[in-house]
């Protein structure tokens, strides 16, 4: 079985190397990234989506399908960990330890968590105008839960974020992202064409709000998946 797995991985590696040979060279003026399309995206960020952060417009609007796929990949990784680690009762390995009580670390942690969470919300909601977005904000919120797990202990930190919410929250994030695209489809546009969202706003502002909606979905997906993976590793799949 091990030999077969190595054979499959080796074959996959050869396929990837062969595909990589067809990629354009760095700095190639004839490469797609160096042609007029990139300039159009940069110039159109404010005009099309009323968003000064070009990176956010690129990720969540112009190539929204790709980012939806990335969000689904993150959630799929969480599902894979769940399937691998959440074994039947007999096969479980007890990996969960009890942290030693420490008043100083407890107080500092409780003081830091709301500050980090507030900054994470800023990162999500201000991603149109400064570096940030759903991936970064979701990861920051997840770190507060992970910090609580490590300092306060698994049982005590359940009040902050129950383990049972991890996978459903990740699924909800993917559903929000895909749902925004489906709503646009229902109202006569292409999937993820936010200018067709039924909000009664100018087209550029519709795309601006659409970007925010999908970024919130990404934040939910990333947060739920990261916490779910960490909890599975921490508890041995309990």
Annotate the PLM regions.
Residues 68-69, 128-141:
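Short, non-helical or kinked segments that cap or interrupt transmembrane helices
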Residues 42, 46-59, 193-210:
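Short, membrane-exposed interhelical loops at transmembrane-helix boundaries
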Residues 4-35, 124:
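N-terminal signal-anchor transmembrane alpha helix
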Residues 21-44, 186-195:
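Interfacial/capping segments of alpha-helical transmembrane domains
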Residues 53-82, 208, 212:
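Individual transmembrane alpha-helix segments
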Residues 1-12, 162-174:
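Alpha-helical transmembrane segments and their helix-start/interface "positive-inside/aromatic belt" motifs
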Residues 95-112:
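Membrane-water interface at loop-to-transmembrane-helix junctions
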Residues 74-83, 143-149, 213-228:
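Hydrophobic cores of alpha-helical transmembrane segments in multi-pass inner/ER membrane proteins
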């Amino acid at each position: 079985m091990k030999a077969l797995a190595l054979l499959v991985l080796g074959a996959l590696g050869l396929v990837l190397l062969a595909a990589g040979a067809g990629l354009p060279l760095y700095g190639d003026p004839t490469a797609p990234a160096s042609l007029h399309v990139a300039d159009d995206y940069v110039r159109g960020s404010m005009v099309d989506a009323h968003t000064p952060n070009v990176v956010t417009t690129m990720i969540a609007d112009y190539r929204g399908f790709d980012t939806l796929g990335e969000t689904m990949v993150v959630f799929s990784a969480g599902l894979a960990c769940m399937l691998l680690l959440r074994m039947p009762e007999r096969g479980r390995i007890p990996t969960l330890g009890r942290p030693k009580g420490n008043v100083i670390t407890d107080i500092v942690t409780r003081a830091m968590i709301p500050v980090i969470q507030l900054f994470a919300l800023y990162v999500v909601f201000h991603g149109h105008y400064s570096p940030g977005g759903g991936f970064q904000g979701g990861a920051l919120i997840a770190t507060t839960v992970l910090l609580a797990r490590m300092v306060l202990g698994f049982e005590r930190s359940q009040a902050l974020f129950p383990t049972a919410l991890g996978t459903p929250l990740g699924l909800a994030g993917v559903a929000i992202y895909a749902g925004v695209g489906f709503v646009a489809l229902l109202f006569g546009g292409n999937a993820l064409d936010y200018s067709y969202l039924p909000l009664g706003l100018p087209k550029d502002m519709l795309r601006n709000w659409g970007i925010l909606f999908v970024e919130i979905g990404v934040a939910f997906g990333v947060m739920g998946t990261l916490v779910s993976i960490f909890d599975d590793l921490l508890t041995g799949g309990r």
